[in-house]
From Swiss-Prot:
The gene is hrpI. This is Harpin secretion protein HrpI. The keyword S-adenosyl-L-methionine does not apply. Involved in the secretion of harpin; a proteinaceous elicitor of the hypersensitivity response in plants. One of its GO terms (cellular component) is plasma membrane. Belongs to the FHIPEP (flagella/HR/invasion proteins export pore) family. Keywords: Cell inner membrane, Cell membrane, Hypersensitive response elicitation, Membrane, Protein transport, Transmembrane, Transmembrane helix, Transport. The chain crosses the membrane at residues 23-43, 45-65, 69-89, 115-135, 203-223, 241-261, 298-318.
C-alpha cells in the first residue's frame, strides 16, 4: 500500500511539473470523446468525475476571498462545458446504439422517474428551466454589467493608484501590484462576459440532446429494433431523463459557481480567510431586530386557521432565540469594547505594550480628569454637564469658539480629586465629590483663633490651590449663620472653571478662528471684509481679537470691530493700540457688561500713584510696561488683594487713564485675571460711577514674612 502511495505521489509531482502537457492532453481527450465510442464502465467514471468537478468548483467559490483569486475560471468554465457536452455525446451514442449508457445514467433515470414517467419528465424540465431562465440568464446579465462597469472604472482607479504613489501612501511595488490586479480584474470580468455564453449554450444544448435522445431512441427502438411502442418509450425515456440529469445537475452547479463568483462584492484589503459563507452569516445576523420581527410574523401565521401551528411555532421560537442570542452577543461585544477602551485609557501611550503606536497624537486642548473610581458615576456626569453648559454659554455670549472637552478617568488621581488641563497642563486642581461645604478661611479666622475648630474644620490643600478655603460638615454650627456664604464642591469647581476658561480661552483665537470670522463677514458684508483684508494682514487681525478675548470683551460685534480697524489700521500697526481703539468703539458694550444696578463699582488710583506709574513707563519693542521698585509692586498687589478678594460679589473694576490701562492690565493679569481694567475713554456719558476707594502705592507696605510669595516678585 505504501508503495502505491509513493507511486501516486511521484505521478502527481510529475503532472504538476508538466502541467501544460497534462492540460493539452485533457483538451485532446475531450475532443476524442466526441468521436470515439467509449465503454460504459469508462462513461460511469467520467460521469462521476464530472459531478465531482462541478461540486468542487461550487465549494471553491464559497471560499474565495475575492473573484480575482480564481482568475482562470473562464477557461475552466470552457473546459468543463466542453467536457460535459462530450460526455453527453458519448452517452447519447450508447443510448441510441445499445440502449445502455452505464449504471449511473440508468440509476438516475429510475430514481427520478420512480415508476411515473410523467413525473420524471416534469422534474427534469423544471431543473432545466431553472438553470436556463433563472441562474444562467441572471449570471449572464450580471457578467455584462460587471464587465462594463469594470472597464469604465479603470481610468479612475489608475489615477487613484498614481495619486497614492505620489502622496507616499503606498510603495512602488505596491502600486505595481495594484496595477497588475486591476489589469487582471478587467480581463477576468471581460472574459466572464463571454464565458457566460458557454453556460447559456450548454443549457440549450442539453434541451436539444434530450429531445434527440427521446425522439431518436423511440424511432430506433420501434422502427429498427421492432420494440413495442410502450416498451420503447419507457426504456428510452428513463435513459434520456437519466442522461439529462447527469448533464443538468453539473451544469446547474457550474452555473451557480459562475453566478457566485461574478456577484461577489469584496472590499479592497479584505482579509485572507474571508469567504462568502462567513460574510452571509455575519450580515444576516447583524440585525437581531429583524429576526425578532420575523419570529412575530411566523407566530402570526401559526394562529391562522388551518395552518400547521406546531411548524410555525417551532420556526418562530428558533428565529426568536436567534435574535435574542444576537442581542446578547452584541451587548457582550460592546461591554468588551468598553473594557478594552477603559484599559487603553488606563495605560499611558508610552506604557502600552500591547500594540505599536502608528499615528500622531497631538496634545488635547481641554481635558477633564477624574479618578477612575468615578467612572459612570452620577457626580462626574453632573459636573461634566454643568461644565459643558458653562462652555456653551461663554461661546454664545462672547462669540469665540472653544475646544471641546476630552474626558479621562485616571487611576493616578485621588478619589476626591478633579483636574482641568489645558494642553494637558493642569490649570485647575480641585476637591470633588465630598459632602463638606467650603467657606472662605478669612471669614472664620476669628473662630479658628479661638480654638473652635473641634477637629471638624479641614483646611484646603495648598497643592489644589485651596489654601484660602476651609471645608466644614453641612451641619456645622458656623454654617447656620445667615450671612455665612458657603459652596459645595461642584459650585466651587464651577467658580474656578469659569475663571480658568476665561483665562485660557484667548489662546484659542488664532489664525484659523480669525479666518472663520472673516469668512462670515465676507458672506454678510463683503465690501467691509475686502477693505479690512486690504488694510491689515490676517495675523494682526487675529492679534487684536486675541487681546480682546483675553480681557473678556465679546467678539460678536464684528462689524464695529472691522470698521474701527479699517479706520485706524491705515496709520497704526501696533496691535495693542488697535485694541484700545476697538475697546473705545465698544464702550457701550463694555459698560453694559460690567454695570450693576447702582452703576459701575470702580477703584481709582490716587493722582500720586498715577504720576508714579506714568514715570515708570518703559517702551519695549512690542509693548509698554512698568519698571517699578519692588516695594511699590508688593504694595500694589497687597492693596489689590484687599480690594478684590476672590469670588467677591461687588463686580468691581479699576478705572485709570488711557495711557496706563494696557500696561496696568498686563501687570495684574496673572493674579487678577478676572479684574477688569477700564479707561475713562471707555465710559459712556450716561453711566453712573460708584467709587469704592483708591489705590495708593505710596502707602507704607506691611512687613513681609519670610515665606511671603511677594518677596521674589519680579517687575
Amino acid at each position: 500500500m505504501s508503495s502505491l502511495f509513493v507511486w501516486l505521489n511521484r505521478l502527481a509531482i510529475s503532472a504538476m511539473q508538466r502541467s501544460e502537457v497534462v492540460g493539452a492532453a485533457i483538451v485532446m481527450s475531450i475532443v476524442f470523446m466526441m468521436i470515439i465510442p467509449l465503454p460504459t464502465g469508462l462513461i460511469d467514471v467520467l460521469i462521476a468525475l464530472n459531478i465531482c468537478i462541478s461540486s468542487l468548483l461550487i465549494v471553491l467559490a464559497m471560499y474565495l476571498p475575492k473573484p480575482l483569486a480564481f482568475s482562470t475560471f473562464p477557461s475552466v468554465l470552457l473546459l468543463t462545458t466542453m467536457f460535459r457536452l462530450a460526455l453527453s455525446i458519448s452517452t447519447t451514442r450508447q443510448i441510441l446504439l445499445q440502449q445502455d449508457a452505464g449504471h449511473i445514467v440508468e440509476a438516475f433515470g429510475n430514481f427520478v422517474v420512480g415508476g411515473n414517467l410523467a413525473v420524471g419528465l416534469v422534474i427534469f424540465l423544471i431543473l432545466t428551466v431553472v438553470n436556463f431562465l433563472v441562474i444562467t440568464k441572471g449570471s449572464e446579465r450580471v457578467a455584462e454589467v460587471a464587465a462594463r462597469f469594470t472597464l469604465d472604472a479603470m481610468p479612475g482607479k489608475q489615477m487613484s493608484i498614481d495619486s497614492d504613489l505620489r502622496a507616499g501612501l503606498i510603495e512602488a511595488h505596491q502600486a505595481r501590484q495594484r496595477r497588475e490586479n486591476l489589469a487582471k480584474e478587467s480581463q477576468l470580468f471581460g472574459a466572464m462576459d463571454g464565458a457566460m455564453k458557454f453556460v447559456k449554450g450548454d443549457a440549450i444544448a442539453g434541451l436539444v440532446i434530450v429531445f434527440i435522445n427521446m425522439i431518436g431512441g423511440f424511432a430506433i427502438g420501434v422502427l429498427q429494433n421492432g420494440m413495442e411502442a410502450g416498451a420503447a418509450m419507457h426504456i428510452y425515456s428513463v435513459l434520456t431523463i437519466g442522461d439529462g440529469l447527469i448533464a443538468q445537475i453539473p451544469a446547474l452547479l457550474i452555473s451557480l459557481t459562475a453566478g457566485m463568483i461574478i456577484t461577489r462584492v469584496s472590499a479592497d484589503g479584505q482579509q485572507v480567510d474571508a469567504n462568502i459563507g462567513r460574510e452571509i452569516a455575519e450580515q444576516l445576523t447583524s440585525q437581531p431586530k429583524a429576526w425578532i420581527m420575523s419570529a412575530a410574523g411566523m407566530l402570526g401565521f401559526a394562529l391562522l386557521p388551518g395552518m400547521p401551528t406546531a411548524v410555525f411555532v417551532i420556526i418562530s421560537a428558533i428565529a426568536l432565540g436567534s435574535g435574542l442570542f444576537q442581542l446578547w452577543r452584541i451587548k457582550q461585544q460592546d461591554s468588551q469594547q468598553q473594557a478594552d477602551e477603559l484599559h487603553a485609557q488606563q495605560l499611558a501611550p508610552e506604557d502600552n505594550g500591547y500594540q505599536d503606536l502608528r499615528r500622531f497624537n497631538p496634545t488635547r486642548a481641554y481635558l477633564l480628569q477624574f479618578s477612575q473610581e468615578h467612572l459612570n458615576s452620577e457626580a462626574a456626569e453632573s459636573l461634566i454637564q454643568h461644565i459643558r453648559r458653562l462652555r456653551n454659554r461663554l461661546v454664545y455670549h462672547f462669540g469665540f469658539t472653544l475646544p471641546s472637552f476630552d474626558i479621562e478617568f485616571s487611576p493616578a488621581l485621588a478619589a476626591d480629586e478633579f483636574r482641568f488641563c489645558v494642553y494637558e497642563i493642569p490649570l485647575v486642581t480641585a476637591t470633588f465629590a465630598v459632602e463638606q461645604l467650603a467657606v472662605r478661611t478669612s471669614s472664620i479666622e476669628i473662630h479658628l483663633a479661638d480654638g473652635e475648630s473641634d477637629g471638624q474644620i479641614q483646611p484646603g490643600q495648598a497643592e489644589r490651590d485651596e489654601h484660602h478655603w476651609c471645608w466644614l460638615p453641612p451641619q456645622h454650627p458656623l454654617l447656620q449663620q445667615e450671612d455665612r456664604r458657603c459652596w459645595n464642591a461642584q459650585q466651587l469647581i464651577m467658580l474656578r472653571m469659569e475663571q480658568a476658561i476665561h483665562q485660557s480661552g484667548a489662546q484659542f483665537i488664532g489664525l484659523q478662528e480669525s479666518k472663520s470670522i472673516l469668512n462670515w463677514l465676507e458672506s454678510e458684508q463683503p465690501e467691509l471684509a475686502q477693505e479690512l483684508q486690504r488694510i491689515m494682514p490676517l495675523s494682526r487681525f487675529a492679534a487684536v481679537l486675541q487681546r480682546l478675548a483675553s480681557e473678556r470683551i465679546p467678539l460678536r460685534s464684528v462689524r464695529t470691530i472691522a470698521e474701527t480697524l479699517i479706520e485706524h489700521g491705515q496709520h497704526e500697526r501696533d496691535s495693542a493700540a488697535l485694541t484700545d481703539f476697538v475697546r473705545i468703539a465698544l464702550k457701550e458694550h463694555i459698560c453694559h457688561q460690567y454695570q450693576q444696578p447702582n452703576g459701575l463699582n470702580v477703584w481709582l488710583l490716587t493722582p500720586e500713584t498715577e504720576e508714579l506709574l506714568r514715570d515708570s513707563l518703559r517702551q519695549a519693542q512690542s509693548e509698554t510696561f512698568f519698571s517699578l521698585a519692588q516695594e511699590y509692586g508688593i504694595n500694589l498687589l497687597n492693596q489689590m488683594r484687599s480690594a478684590f478678594p476672590p469670588y467677591d460679589n461687588h463686580h468691581a473694576l479699576i478705572l485709570v487713564a488711557q495711557d496706563l490701562r494696557s500696561p496696568l492690565r498686563a501687570l495684574l493679569k496673572d493674579e487678577f485675571h478676572a479684574v477688569p481694567v477700564l479707561s475713562f475713554a471707555e465710559l459712556t456719558s450716561n453711566v453712573a460711577i460708584n467709587v469704592l476707594g483708591r489705590l495708593d502705592l505710596q502707602q507704607s507696605p506691611p512687613e513681609l514674612q519670610e515665606n511671603d510669595p511677594c518677596m521674589n516678585y519680579a517687575y
